[in-house]
């Protein structure tokens, strides 16, 4: 009997006790992503036996990220030293139209590798076993197969599996589960130009290049990253180089990769051949498709599955599903926008709507969109124009 669910199951896997006794109780997490390590930490801290398999001992390379302070709601003790820089507002540009968006609470600029390293320490300290250098290569009956670079293989049996191995998840492929759609992401480290405010990020809407946007995120008073996200098949390096040249900026280094996107029919829980698989983070498409941000929502997804496995219900997962669904609907509208649509939108934003946008964290859009429409009901016409096009 196969089961795969996009909607949340009302019958999560019940915990079989909170002690570490019994091999049948252990939880296998495949992938040392931020979402995977966060889930490992929370589950191990609650007394569950957790083993994390990660093929890359270095836990992947650096990437500068921007997150909202909503992260503190999920991780109250997030270390202050992990915040490299604070962003107090955004400059939004479309053509020649500019809108300054002050934030009530500053966003944080963080470094992915540093956050992973810290979570690795927390997970190990809580009792999770971290096995690096092992790649998941498939399954044989009820056994999971892992291989080292030297060709050594081991086979493990685990009833509960958290797939935390990214947008191109091998786990989901091995179990015949759908993987999320992906976007390309590329950004260049640059010296901040004289016209840039170190306290404000800049967003340019250029739909003829990408249905998403370009960004400049300062990570210090002197430097930042300029990048874009776009769909596979578009010449992302050419687009970035051209935009850098247009702004008169020289790339110092590049950071790139793929990022998952959310789709409502992606499974949150699936049963296959005696296993129960929970995709989290990018593997689960737990990414805000409006902004292509997945750090906070990935952590949210890891915590939601931990709550379910510990018998605390699916409430947190349902809230995340509603949040990602709201971003999905807004993205469907924005992907139809032309440059003229963005110009009209920025030009037409009133003071109340601008203030509301700055007060609502991007990780609370599901509730905030109603506040925004209440502040400026006329925005509905922009949404309808995008939907009907």
Task: Name the predicted role of every residue range.
Residues 28, 32, 41-63:
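Glycine-rich FAD pyrophosphate-binding loop
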Residues 168-241:
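Conserved FAD-binding catalytic core of PHBH/FMO-like flavoproteins
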